[in-house]
Amino acid sequence: MIIKDIYGKDILTSDNYIALGSFDGLHLGHLSLIHKVHEEAQKNGGRSIVYTFKNHPRALLNKDDAPKLLMDNNEKAEFLEKCGVDILYFQEFNKEFMEMTPKEFIEFLINRFNIKGLIVGFNYKFGYKNMGDTELLKELQKEYNFKLFIMEPCKYDGKVIS
């Protein structure tokens, strides 16, 4: 597996399928995204990418509110490699990234990673003030011509657990 810091300037030209999320701990919901990105990449001859944060977003917004991470980035990388992920990108959550609009973020992904498929959870939020959501992604997939996969919540005993 290739591990990248997003500050690198490489642009990927192969067809890529990307799972987005904070992946602060790898629970059942995260595993469903990872399985789907791997499956779609293999089925379509592309590469699987997990795009996540180096630091938890709440650590920038309010350090006292930042959750304790269940895995550090090295453990996360080892686990994702065992899951068959081709490329892991770590994004520093900083002021510049935080102020990116939802559309700017998707344009960045399209231009940088040649995205053919985007995999997110049912409650995925992104962009400035979390203004982007799965409904916006449904609109943007038409404009930017990528497949969108929204994973359903994982339930146990009828209750959403992730």
What are these regions (language model features)?
Residues 1-162:
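Nucleotidyltransferase catalytic core that binds NTPs
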